[in-house]
Design a protein with these regions (language model features):
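Phosphate/dinucleotide-binding and metal-coordinating scaffold of catalytic cores
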Residues: 1-262, 266-268, 280-385
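Conserved protein-kinase catalytic-loop segment immediately C-terminal to the catalytic Asp
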Residues: 273, 278-280
Length: 385
């Protein structure tokens, strides 16, 4: 590391100093050097951070925009940043995130958490628009005002503050006739969760942004509670290892995992991965407090099904049989292995399930929606067998 251009940064929890490191944030080399760990505050270090130079680097990388995000190059180029300089993104946005209350403070900045945090301070609507559409002019603004730089996922999305609350807007994929239906699945999956009694985030549909259909949901974290994806706490061993870990946390965590397996089998969620479920952390104590609500169901309920399926039951059935879960082998086997008496009661409610078409002015065509309803009912029957 070239000492003459290296800068010292401190990872903080609110304003509490946790760890100071030195790095050249403008270099392609992501090496860093730990200067100090504040032992008196060690209990407040991020639960998903390993105290080593490689561990700090991994933790920082989790706080930058993913390379597969829609419009990522457009967003970064408009503010003079590059994916090839991940630590430069951290330096610019202070490592701030709407997942938690940690941040990365440059030596001598004079900043405080109150001054820069994303929960209380205004977002840049210009940057939000670029993040969602890919269009916009180059701008000079504080990147600490843009939560998009630390939001995961590949779909176009942005955050907006409305009436004192923070909402995530998320679009769909585009380019082919079978794409762009993810927002509908977010809405309809929530309706299934409601009937089952599963703890899931509420989604609505809107065309508020650029007249493009997108899903909208309220932020579920706050200055009181953080979110950690389970994959950052359990790094190997799959669902079995996660179950064993949850058993150490308490029965409510085990119940939540079992409910998720049943729910995902019903909605045929092909994109449940170790980044979109996890735990909530009490920020006052930095301890795990509860299972996080379920979210991110755009790749469920056959959102990628081709237009030829919706008037052809045989073709749809054949297509549905090809869909598999991402994190384990089989929807029904995993759900049945986790079934408890309470799940039978949940599933009985789905035997005559119908979507609430009155919940939105934007609905799928009746033939498509009816076929999905029938499949939800069928999958409930399979689990009850």
């Amino acid at each position: 590391m070239k000492g003459e251009i290296a800068v010292r940064y401190t990872i903080r929890h609110f304003d509490l100093p946790l760890l100071t490191f030195e790095a050249n944030m403008d270099s392609a080399d992501t090496d860093l050097h730990i200067i100090k760990v504040y032992e008196e505050n060690r209990s407040f270090l991020p639960l998903n951070l390993t105290v080593s130079e490689d561990g700090v680097e991994r933790w920082l990388r989790h706080r930058t925009i993913p390379k597969n995000r829609a419009y990522v190059d457009a967003l970064l180029s408009k503010v003079g940043l590059s994916l090839n300089r991940p630590l430069g993104i951290i330096a610019a946005n202070k490592g701030l995130s709407l997942n938690d209350c940690f941040w990365v403070d440059a030596e001598g900045s004079g900043d405080t958490f109150e001054k820069v945090n994303l929960y209380d301070n205004r977002f840049s609507q210009v940057l939000a628009a670029i993040a969602f559409t890919g269009y916009g002019s180059s701008i000079r603004t504080s990147l600490a005002s843009c939560p998009e730089f630390s939001t995961n996922g590949m779909l176009p999305k942005c955050w907006r503050r409305q009436n004192g609350k923070i909402y995530l807007y998320k679009g769909g994929t585009s380019g082919f006739s079978n794409l762009g239906f993810e927002p509908y699945s977010e809405l309809y999956a929530y309706q299934v969760a409601q009937v089952m009694g599963v703890n899931a985030i509420r989604y609505t549909l809107t065309k508020e942004l650029n007249k493009t259909l997108c899903s909208k949901c309220e932020l579920f974290t706050s200055k009181e509670h953080s979110y950690i994806p389970i994959g950052q706490l359990v790094s190997k061993g799959g669902i079995k290892a996660i179950l064993a870990y949850y058993q150490t946390l308490g029965q409510n965590f085990v119940d939540a995992l079992e409910d998720m397996l049943a729910f995902d089998a019903i909605i045929c969620n092909t994109d449940r991965h170790y980044g979109n479920f996890g735990v909530l952390v009490d920020n006052k104590t930095n301890t795990i407090a509860a299972p996080a609500p379920l979210f991110d169901h755009g790749n469920s309920l056959f959102s990628l099904g081709g237009t030829d399926l919706w008037d052809n039951q045989k073709a749809f059935d054949e297509y549905a049989r090809t869909l598999l879960p991402l994190a384990y082998d089989d929807f029904f086997a995993a759900a049945k292995s986790a079934m408890k008496p309470r799940h039978r009661a949940m599933l009985h409610k789905l035997l005559d399930f119908h979507f609430d078409r009155r919940a939105t002015r934007y609905n799928l065509p009746p033939n498509r929606l009816k076929m999905i309803e029938k499949e939800v009912q069928r999958r409930a029957r399979v689990l009850l067998e």
